[in-house]
Amino acid sequence: ESKFVQGFIKMANDGYLQGWHERNGGNLSYRLKPEEVEMIRPRLNAPGEWIPIGVEVPGLAGEFFLVTGSGKYFRNIIVDPEVCLAIIELDETGMNYRIRWGLVEGGRPTSELPTHLMNHEVKKKLTNGKHRVIYHAHTTNTIALTFVLPLDDKIFTRELWESATECPVVFPDGVGVVGWMVPGGREIAIKTADRKSVV
């Protein structure tokens, strides 16, 4: 197993053990480094058909991503990564993807793929390529706050900053709050892509 795959599996399992991934809740994606792609290239499947992403991400054209599968349970990733995960490749337009590894029992990448990729494109630009992970978890305490606080960026930011001293360090520019939306579509991808950290 490659080190980046081991790290991905550990992160997914750590989140599951925290109680952040009920059933098939949440998703995770990692943008591979060029040297990682070359290291695993012999293990990749033959190129298949291109599938539309549903959004355009030209800043990610030709890149590879390790992603969780749609409907897959985080608790099972550590047991059977080839069933639960996929490595996908984007085409040269950033409009289509194809599966190059994983999902051996069928399936597709996370239904939140458009959101993940739009956020990866933003983070890549903002951090000069340093930022490589998008993680969507159902953190119980944060979910509870959505029932007692107004859904306002500044109010949420202040409450989170006051709740743990590390929060201002982790997200010094605050968080963005997106109201309830149907997951997995273009609209939620656009809404989350214009924020640095999203609740």
Q: What residue ranges belong to the model's regions?
A:
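Glycine-rich flexible loops
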Residues: 1-199
